[in-house]
Amino acid sequence: MSNKKIEQWEIERYWEIFASLSNGQPRLNNSQAASVLRNSRLRDEQLEKVWDLADVDGDGELDFEEFCVAMRLVFDLVNGELQSVPQHLPDWLVPESKAHLVQATRVLSTGSEQFERIEDEDDTPGLKDGFDWYMNPSDKAKYEEIYSANKNQRGEISFGSLQPLYDSLDVPDTDIRSAWNLVNPSASPEINKDATLAFLHILNYRHEGYRIPRTIPASLRASFENNKIDYQVDNARPAQRWGPNGDTETPTGRKAKFGDTYLSRLGVGGKASYTPKGTDFNNTIQDEEWEKVRLRRELAELEAKLDSAKKASEGRRDQPRNDGRPSWVLVKKEALQLLDYKERELRELREGTGRSKDGQDLERIREDIRTVGEQVDGLKSHLARRNEYLHDLRRQVEEEKLSR
């Protein structure tokens, strides 16, 4: 697996750009993102391909995770890390919350048929439209718990195995069966993990008063019908550097109650068995002074350890240090140097100087060259005049000698 990843400082920088463009909204549309993307001077067809790759959920907009993907692709193209836009999103760039969509899209690209229209008669008055297939990290973690508690040896779920969950929900039996049929187009007695997560997601939204969707995206259906997907974390974890911590707040208080009673009965409530690891977008710091604060906190911890070490070493100061333990004075000195370095980097970032500048403006360089050229010409003219003056002085000296 590639060792490449999006560094934390990149995420913080991308957040500053995203926040300045989004006006407080969770997503950017094409026109909002166009200004910063076109500053890269990439061709329009390249930017279109970057957009298509980054828009993982295909909603025509970029949320923050997708924006990070787009920015990293653009920078890699500009810096020569990539010679062309890749055909598929690299595994290390796939956001954890959308890994199932990317995996399903890849399955679909091998030739799976398009999604079919699934008819239902869910026209119950009072239900809301606006169902969203996107699973936020906290909801997905809860679905994972329910799946893990009920899966059989083949990693599949039967309809009847979730009956206690159905009993705890405010969802009619007809709607539950409609959701099951939606994710189980082949009418199998059991469904795989992807289908189970989608099934629970539909029930969650229906529990909150949203109308059950009539169709299912082609990419999702392809993943439902593919029984060879490997879900072992050690074998396939395409988004290991993007894992959120599962603490994201849900949009409404009612949604947070989905499955809680059921999970409490199982003894796993609040303890998600699925814990993705990697970059935590929910902890992205928006304050540019964050780095200084964090380093000062680390320095305080080091000083506390230093004081403790000094107290423990009282009475043994004259003994030779042959135990290989670190010198806390040196550690403190290095930490202070690191703090000074980080503060200087932050200052350069704010002022747009130092290594933070990608290069001098070409036009300004040309102007400097012209100025230097003019100065050289002026110096040459001045030298010629001084040589003429010197020659004249020598002539006068010779004439004076002859006159004597």
Swiss-Prot record:
Supply the PROSITE patterns for this chain: EF_HAND_1, EF_HAND_2, EH
The UniProt GO MF terms for this protein read: actin binding; calcium ion binding
Q: What are the EH domain coordinates in residue numbering?
A: 10-100, 139-227
- Membrane topology annotation: Peripheral membrane protein
Q: Where in the cell is it found?
A: Cell membrane; Endosome membrane; Cytoplasm, Cytoskeleton, Actin patch
Question: Which Pfam families does this chain map to?
Answer: EH, End3
User: Does the record carry Transferase as a key word?
Assistant: no
Q: Which residues bind Ca(2+)?
A: D55, D57, D59, E61, E66
Q: Where is this region: Disordered?
A: 237-256, 307-326
**Which spans are transmembrane here?**
none
Q: Which residues form a coiled coil?
A: 279-381
Entry keywords, A to Z: Actin-binding, Calcium, Cell membrane, Coiled coil, Cytoplasm, Cytoskeleton, Endocytosis, Endosome, Membrane, Metal-binding, Repeat
Q: Which family does it belong to?
A: Belongs to the END3 family.
Protein name as it appears in the record: Actin cytoskeleton-regulatory complex protein end3
Q: Which organism is it from?
A: Aspergillus terreus (strain NIH 2624 / FGSC A1156)
What lineage does the source organism belong to?
Answer: Eukaryota, Fungi, Dikarya, Ascomycota, Pezizomycotina
What is the gene name? Answer: end3
